[in-house]
């Protein structure tokens, strides 16, 4: 059974912390939206739904959940494909699916969790062969498909975040430092070439605003207008 939990061991303290933090978030929205009741109601509904889902998932034995690795990976690909084929477009990006009752959801956010589970299984399954080129190549190919589909939405930020997450999974899986140092040795010069090409809009898979945001992060003074959003998010 997936659900086989001793409630005496349940960490209710974490649940209380989540509720308190969510309450602070609701108050912040109440203040920022000039007490817009519709926004507050939507936020509270999302919190309740999220809490129910989080509690259910916390009761699942993750080791048994990993036995569904093929289904999990398949669901990630199917949902991302559904976004590209029939997703809702807003602001030039197609990132959302409209579901009955629930409303708009962004599958890429759930895909992060799915890929963590899948690649946790993958590198556990092939632990003894983890440093073989074929093992890493297959893992890279399996990651490339959903990553490309997220990038096509377009959603560069989520693609980068997901890449860092899966890279962390690979690092924690016990891959040899020779591979890590080798990859870094290749990435550093490639990064310099990337920045150079970025300045002259020579990166075909990046939209104009995406390139500008990256350049603003590297050189905020020269791209002060584009850096405004990043600067205010830090404040």
Would you name each region that the model predicts?
Residues 126, 169-171, 220-223:
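Flexible, glycine/proline-enriched loop segments at strand-loop-helix junctions
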């Amino acid at each position: 059974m997936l659900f086989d939990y001793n409630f005496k061991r349940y960490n209710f303290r974490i649940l209380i912390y989540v509720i308190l933090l969510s309450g602070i978030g609701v108050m912040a929205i109440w203040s920022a939206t000039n007490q817009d009741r519709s926004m507050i109601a939507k936020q509270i509904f999302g919190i309740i739904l999220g809490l129910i889902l989080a509690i259910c998932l916390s009761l699942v034995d993750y080791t048994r959940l990993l036995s569904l690795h093929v289904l999990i990976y398949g669901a990630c690909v199917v949902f991302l494909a559904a976004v590209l084929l029939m997703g809702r477009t807003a602001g030039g990006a197609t990132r959302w699916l409209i579901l009955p009752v629930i409303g708009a959801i962004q599958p890429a956010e759930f895909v992060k969790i799915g890929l963590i589970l899948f690649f946790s299984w993958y590198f556990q399954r092939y632990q003894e062969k983890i440093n073989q080129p074929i093992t890493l190549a297959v893992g890279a190919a399996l990651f490339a498909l959903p990553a490309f589909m997220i990038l096509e939405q377009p959603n560069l930020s989520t693609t980068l975040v997901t890449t860092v997450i899966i890279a962390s999974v690979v690092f924690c899986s016990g891959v040899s430092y020779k591979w890590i140092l080798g990859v870094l040795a290749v990435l550093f010069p490639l990064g310099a070439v990337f920045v150079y090409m970025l300045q002259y809009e020579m990166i075909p898979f990046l939209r104009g605003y995406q390139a500008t945001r990256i350049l603003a992060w590297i050189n905020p003074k020269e791209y002060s207008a584009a850096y405004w959003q990043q600067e205010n998010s830090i404040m």
